[in-house]
Amino acid sequence: MADSIIQSPDLGDVTGYLRERIRTVPDWPQPGVMFRDITPLLQDPKTLRVLIDVFVHRYMDAQLDLVAGIDARGFILGAIVAYELNLGFVPIRKKGKLPFQTVAEEYELEYGSATVEIHADACKTGDRVLLVDDLIATGGTMMAGRKLLERLGATVVEGAAIVDLPELGGSKLLHGAGLPLFTVCKFEGH
């Protein structure tokens, strides 16, 4: 499946521009994995601006109330996008990291399970929320984040990420569950 092409008068193919700057680290964190490292996108100010502008232009008229970001790289992207859209930011954290009353959601990993949490007062009924992470692999983390927000009465308008790894099935899972999904680029393989 080809990437959707995002065009810019200054840069041309923005999708390609950003995709070329994502570093691939073979065999990390384990043999056979091709890790897609987004940190080069964050290190260069021009590239970071281009990345954030992609999300800001997509969501500037979406009538959102909040942006929620998933621990940890979703915090980086989500907080900047929230700031640029003049919205509040909600962190969805790994279990045991939030100091106030929380709501938790367990989800399955390839080997075992994990839990994410959100403050019980993080959003209110009717809030329209953009849910952000850096990458979609199996979709489990984003699905858990969506469930947390919906349990608090919010509507997740869309899930958004920089990278989709479609072979791992996450984007298919999320689409199948009725969650609209936007990603900047796709990479085949793990």
Swiss-Prot record:
<dbReference type="GO" id="GO:0003999">
    <property type="term" value="F:adenine phosphoribosyltransferase activity"/>
</dbReference>
<dbReference type="GO" id="GO:0006166">
    <property type="term" value="P:purine ribonucleoside salvage"/>
</dbReference>
<dbReference type="InterPro" id="IPR000836">
    <property type="entry name" value="PRibTrfase_dom"/>
</dbReference>
<dbReference type="InterPro" id="IPR029057">
    <property type="entry name" value="PRTase-like"/>
</dbReference>
<comment type="pathway">
    <text>Purine metabolism; AMP biosynthesis via salvage pathway; AMP from adenine: step 1/1.</text>
</comment>
<dbReference type="InterPro" id="IPR005764">
    <property type="entry name" value="Ade_phspho_trans"/>
</dbReference>
<keyword id="KW-0963">Cytoplasm</keyword>
<dbReference type="Pfam" id="PF00156">
    <property type="entry name" value="Pribosyltran"/>
</dbReference>
<dbReference type="GO" id="GO:0005737">
    <property type="term" value="C:cytoplasm"/>
</dbReference>
<protein>
    <recommendedName>
        <fullName>Adenine phosphoribosyltransferase</fullName>
        <ecNumber>2.4.2.7</ecNumber>
    </recommendedName>
</protein>
<keyword id="KW-0660">Purine salvage</keyword>
<dbReference type="InterPro" id="IPR050120">
    <property type="entry name" value="Adenine_PRTase"/>
</dbReference>
<keyword id="KW-0328">Glycosyltransferase</keyword>
<dbReference type="GO" id="GO:0044209">
    <property type="term" value="P:AMP salvage"/>
</dbReference>
<comment type="function">
    <text>Catalyzes a salvage reaction resulting in the formation of AMP, that is energically less costly than de novo synthesis.</text>
</comment>
<dbReference type="GO" id="GO:0006168">
    <property type="term" value="P:adenine salvage"/>
</dbReference>
<keyword id="KW-0808">Transferase</keyword>
<comment type="subunit">
    <text>Homodimer.</text>
</comment>
<comment type="similarity">
    <text>Belongs to the purine/pyrimidine phosphoribosyltransferase family.</text>
</comment>
